[in-house]
Amino acid sequence: MFLKFCIVAFAICLSINLSEGAPRSGTIYNFAIIADLDKKSISPKNDNNYKSIVKVGELIEVGDKYSVKMKKEDHEIFTKYAYKGRGAELSEFLIYKWKLYTFDDKSGIVFRLKTNADLIPWVTLANGNGDQTDGFKAEWATTKGDKMYVGSTGISFTDKTGKLNSNSLWIKEIDQDGKVQSLDWKEQYDKIKSAMKIPNGFIWHEAVNWSKLKNQWVFLPRKCSERPFDTKTEETIGCNKIIIASENFEIIKSIQIKGKSINRAAGFSSFKFLPDSDDQILLALKTIEKDDKTATYITVIDITGRVLMPEMQINSDKYEGIVLLKSTEGFLKRSQ
C-alpha cells in the first residue's frame, strides 16, 4: 500500500512539472522580465545596434507567503530596427500561440523572442487608427480568444502645436497570421475614468489583461489623477488601484490596493495571473521614472486589493514586461 502511494505521489509531481505554467512542486514559479532602457538602449559602439536586457527569477510560495529570488545573469538581446534613432525600448512580454513576444514602444514593432535570444520582427503597428507614418506606442498586451490585443497609455493630450493627439486611445487586434485591425477605445477608457470618479482627469495604462476564467478585463494603472494630463507633474504620481471591467465595459469596479507603495510615483507596468489561482492572484511589476532616475519593484496582490507580498526593489533599471515560464533552463542561450 505504501509503495502504491509513493508511485501515485511521484506521478502527481511529474504531472505538475510538465504542465505549462505550473509551479515546480506547487511552490516555485519561473518568470522573466524585460527592460525598457530608454536612451541607454543605444549601443555605445555606434554600430546601429539597440539593446534590451532580460532577467529571470523565481517566485517562491510557502503557505500563504511569497518571496522572490532574482538570478544575477543579464541576458542581452539586440536589434537594428529603430525609429528616429531609438529602438529596443521593450514594454511588455506575452506568450501567444506558444511563442514569446515583446513590443517596442518607439518603432511599434512586435518582436518574437526566440530561445536563442534572436529578436524577429513579426508585425509593425502604425500609430492611432493605423493610417499614420509613425509607430504605435505599445504599452500593454494580452490575449483574448484567438487574438492578441495591444494597447497604449489610453490618454489624449495637446501637442506642442496645440493639436489634440488621441493616438493612444486606439488599440490593436492581431490575429495569428499577423493581420492587424485598429479599434477605437475612447469610450472604454472614458468609462474607466468615470468609474474611478475622475472624468476630467487621466489614467495612464501599461498593465492590462483579459481574464478568460472570469470573462473580464483587469487593469492595474500606472498613473491616475483627477487633474488633466500634465507632463510636468505626471512623473510625480503613480496609482494604487485595480480596475475590473465586464467584457462590454457596462460593469466596472475600482478597487483600492490596501498596502502602501514604497514610492508614490511608482506605478504598474505589467502583471500576470498566477497559475491555479483562478485568476485571483497577480504577480506585478511597478516602475518609476523620475528626475532621470529609474527603478523596478515587484509585488504580489490579489484581485480584492490585498497585498500578499509587499513591494521590493529588484533593479535600478526600468523593466516593463513580465511573463511566467514553464522553465528557464537554457532560456536565451545563444548557439555557439
Swiss-Prot record:
Q: Matching Pfam families, A to Z? A: Apyrase
Write down the chemical reaction(s) this protein catalyses: a ribonucleoside 5'-triphosphate + 2 H2O = a ribonucleoside 5'-phosphate + 2 phosphate + 2 H(+)
Gene Ontology process terms (BP):
immune system process; proteoglycan biosynthetic process
Specify whether NADP is a keyword of the entry: no
What does the record say about tissue specificity? Salivary gland (at protein level).
Q: Can you tell which superkingdom this protein's organism belongs to?
A: Eukaryota
A single Gene Ontology MF term assigned here is: calcium-dependent ATPase activity
Q: Which UniProt keywords apply?
A: ATP-binding, Calcium, Glycoprotein, Hemostasis impairing toxin, Hydrolase, Immunity, Metal-binding, Nucleotide-binding, Platelet aggregation inhibiting toxin, Secreted, Signal, Toxin
- Sugar attachment sites are N209
Q: Which GO terms describe its cellular component?
A: extracellular region
Q: What is its EC number?
A: 3.6.1.5
Q: Where in the cell is it found?
A: Secreted
**Cofactor(s) annotated in UniProt:** Ca(2+)
* Broad enzyme group: hydrolase
According to the record, the signal peptide region is 1-21
Family, similarity comment: Belongs to the apyrase family.
Q: What does this protein do?
A: Facilitates hematophagy by inhibiting ADP-dependent platelet aggregation in the host. Cleaves adenosine triphosphate (ATP) and adenosine diphosphate (ADP) to adenosine monophosphate (AMP) and inorganic phosphate in calcium-dependent manner. Triggers proliferation of host peripheral blood mononuclear cells (PBMCs) and IFN-gamma/IFNG production.
Q: What is this protein called?
A: Apyrase
